[in-house]
Amino acid sequence: MAVFHDEVEIEDFQYDEDSETYFYPCPCGDNFCITKEDLENGEDVATCPSCSLIIKVIYDKDQFTCGETVPAPSTNKELVKC
């Protein structure tokens, strides 16, 4: 079991759209970071690249769903393999 330095809500992070990464200040002077892809995959641990501290990210997993929603095919249509 990991020992977290803190628990921080995702709203308190800074978001960089170019890298799709969330950042939060670390006591060592660097930043904890976690990517949008990590959050979509259900990860909730942000790490600091400069020290061994980690924090737990508190967020609504439903807001970070991976992939797109595809409607189910109608039952009265024949499926054709492409």
From Swiss-Prot:
Keyword annotations from UniProtKB, A to Z: Cytoplasm, Iron, Metal-binding, Nucleus
Residues reported to bind Fe cation: 26, 28, 48, 51
Gene: DPH3
Database matches in PROSITE patterns: DPH_MB
Cofactor: Fe(2+)
Family recorded in the similarity comment: Belongs to the DPH3 family.
The UniProt record lists the keyword Metal-binding: yes
PANTHER family: DIPHTHAMIDE BIOSYNTHESIS PROTEIN 3 (PTHR21454:SF31), DPH3 HOMOLOG-RELATED (PTHR21454)
GO cellular component labels: cytosol; nucleoplasm; protein-containing complex
Protein location: Cytoplasm; Nucleus
Domain remark text: The DPH-type metal-binding (MB) domain can also bind zinc. However, iron is the physiological binding partner as zinc binding impairs the protein electron donor function.
SUPFAM superfamilies named among the record's database cross-references: CSL zinc finger
Keyword Isomerase in annotation: no
Protein name per Swiss-Prot or TrEMBL: Diphthamide biosynthesis protein 3
InterPro entries xrefs: DPH3/4-like (IPR044248), DPH_MB_dom (IPR007872), DPH_MB_sf (IPR036671)
Single GO MF annotation: ferrous iron binding
DPH-type MB domain segment(s): 4-60
